[in-house]
């Protein structure tokens, strides 16, 4: 009698485990399959802007996306991409060199971006970026990604931030021979960047 009860226990746990595996696999693969289906049928996935309204489509990538298949991006209509290179004064993206190298062989225009850290000087951040990103013909201008990231509610000093950004902009423009692009959310733009117009 114990063996019969033990057999039911094994069956229940096996079925439960299989259901759990199917739920996890579904959570991972359903969004990917939906994206593939929508793209292959000519429809836009929900998080992609309509090509009628925005005919030029781009992307940004970092270590977070892993290895990039540039042919797939190109087949999805991506015509330009910014690759994360650096952050602050001493961080470089672990995938940058590989992404930069392999992207050069694709038909996608590429550029590099730097994640700005408010607590670091503009000069040191520019130096970090310039050490990692080579001066290369036919690449997009460098980008400085300026985002508020501290949840403490204490905002960085406006004038100090503007001074540091100006120093970084000047150094990057001098080094690469082109004006850098500033990327920011609307609130950050209004508070820290609108003065650069």
Regions found by a protein language model. Name each.
Residues 190-197:
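Substrate-binding cleft/loops of secretory-pathway carbohydrate-active enzymes
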């Amino acid at each position: 009698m114990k063996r019969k009860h033990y057999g039911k226990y094994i069956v229940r746990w096996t079925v439960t485990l299989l259901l759990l595996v199917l739920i996890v696999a579904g959570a991972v693969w359903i969004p990917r399959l939906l994206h593939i289906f929508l793209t292959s049928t000519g429809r836009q996935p929900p998080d992609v802007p309509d090509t009628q309204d925005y005919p030029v489509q781009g992307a940004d990538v970092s270590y977070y996306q892993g290895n990039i298949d540039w042919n797939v991006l190109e087949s999805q209509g991506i015509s330009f991409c910014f690759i994360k290179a650096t952050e602050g004064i001493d961080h470089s993206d672990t995938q940058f060199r590989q992404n930069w190298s392999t992207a050069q062989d694709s038909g996608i225009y590429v550029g590099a971006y730097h994640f700005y850290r408010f607590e670091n000087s503009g000069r040191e951040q520019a130096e970090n970026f310039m050490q990692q990103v080579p001066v290369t013909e036919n690449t997009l201008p460098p980008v400085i990604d300026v985002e508020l990231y501290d949840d403490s509610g204490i905002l960085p000093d406006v004038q100090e931030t503007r001074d540091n950004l100006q120093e970084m902009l000047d150094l990057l423009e001098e080094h690469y021979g082109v004006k850098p692009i500033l990327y920011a959310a609307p609130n950050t733009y209004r508070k820290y960047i609108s003065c650069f117009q």
